[in-house]
Structure formats: structure tokens, C-alpha cells
Amino acid sequence: MIVGLIGVVEKISALEAHIEVQGVVYGVQVSMRTSALLETGQKVRLKILQVIKEDANLLYGFLEESEKILFERLLKINGVGGRIALAILSSFSPNEFENIIATKEVKRLQQVPGIGKKLADKIMVDLIGFFIQDENRPARNEVFLALESLGFKSAEINKVLKTLKPNLSIEAAIKEALQQLRS
């Protein structure tokens, strides 16, 4: 599995960058925001999410870990694929998107190409509670994703996350959350 690339930007388009790494050129899907920050000939380090499908092996690239985490979370929402998740990241930074979810601005979300009212509402419902407002947010988001990947529902996870002690390590938080969810 490819989780990162360090190489030279060979070619850039709106939603794709070609990165040359030791003689091999990788086609990486990127948001328009990321694309705008890249320059041909620039040495770059991208965080990669590799998605293997029946008919495709796709690489999605991110300059920031927060973008990658948000992208992964968006892919878990039924009806949101890579194209729509990239459109969201092209339209909003992770912080802007977090604000949109927190303030329930469905209309702004509907401005993203490919998102209608129904999908915007679904995204709002699924992401409420994903963005936790405290200094431990990145760790809490990782705990959320880990529990969700184990099959727990967003509502259950959010309820348990509110009860966890704030300074737990990610591992300890997952362990404690699992104990609460299984009891």
C-alpha cells in the first residue's frame, strides 16, 4: 500500500498531478486547492490514500494530514465518492468545511458541484460530532474513525467520545470507548 510520495512534480492539471519518484511517474488525484499550490519541477511530499477498486487503482494526494483525514471520512458517507470528496476539498479548506458543518450551512454545501439538497443533508447528519471542538481534536477524530471502521454508528461514537477523559492517548481512548460501546 502506498501511503506517501516524495518526488518532483512533472505535470499538473486541475485535479491531477504527475509525480516522478526515482524514474516512476505516479498519477495522483488532488483537490484544486492542492493543485494550485504545486509547481512543475517542485519537490513535493504528498500524503497518499490508495483506493483499489475492481476497475481502478487510484492514488489521492494531500499536502496536509487534515485534508486526508477529512477525505477518508467523507468517503465513508453513502453517496460520496472520490469525485465529490475532492470537489468538497477543492471548494473548502478543512477548517472552512468544519465551520459549515458546525453552523449547518446546507446551502453552502449545495454549491459544491455534484451535491444536491438530499446529499448535503446526509453529509450534515453524518458529520455532526466528527469535528470536536477542543485541543485534542486530531486525536479524537482518529478515535472516531477507528471506532467507525469497527462498525459502530456515528451517534453511538459521539455519545461515548463526550464521556472520555480529555488527555487520553489515542490507544487508551479507543480501548476505553470500546469498553463503553460493548457494555
From Swiss-Prot:
Protein's job: The RuvA-RuvB-RuvC complex processes Holliday junction (HJ) DNA during genetic recombination and DNA repair, while the RuvA-RuvB complex plays an important role in the rescue of blocked DNA replication forks via replication fork reversal (RFR). RuvA specifically binds to HJ cruciform DNA, conferring on it an open structure. The RuvB hexamer acts as an ATP-dependent pump, pulling dsDNA into and through the RuvAB complex. HJ branch migration allows RuvC to scan DNA until it finds its consensus sequence, where it cleaves and resolves the cruciform DNA.
Keyword terms: Cytoplasm, DNA damage, DNA recombination, DNA repair, DNA-binding
Location in or out of the cell: Cytoplasm
Region (Flexible linker): 139
Region (Domain I): 1-63
Family note: Belongs to the RuvA family.
Listed name of the protein: Holliday junction branch migration complex subunit RuvA
Nucleotide-binding found in the keyword field: no
Coiled coil: none
Domain of life: Bacteria
Region annotation Domain II: where it falls in the sequence: 64-139
NCBIfam families (UniProt xref): ruvA
GO BP annotations, alphabetical order: DNA recombination; DNA repair
Domain description: Has three domains with a flexible linker between the domains II and III and assumes an 'L' shape. Domain III is highly mobile and contacts RuvB.
InterPro entries: DNA_helicase_Holl-junc_RuvA_I, Hlx-hairpin-Hlx_DNA-bd_motif, NA-bd_OB-fold, RuvA, RuvA_2-like, RuvA_C, RuvA_C_sf
Region (Domain III): 139-183
Molecular function, one GO term: four-way junction helicase activity
GO CC annotation: cytoplasm; Holliday junction helicase complex; Holliday junction resolvase complex
Lineage, opening ranks: Bacteria, Pseudomonadati, Campylobacterota, Epsilonproteobacteria, Campylobacterales
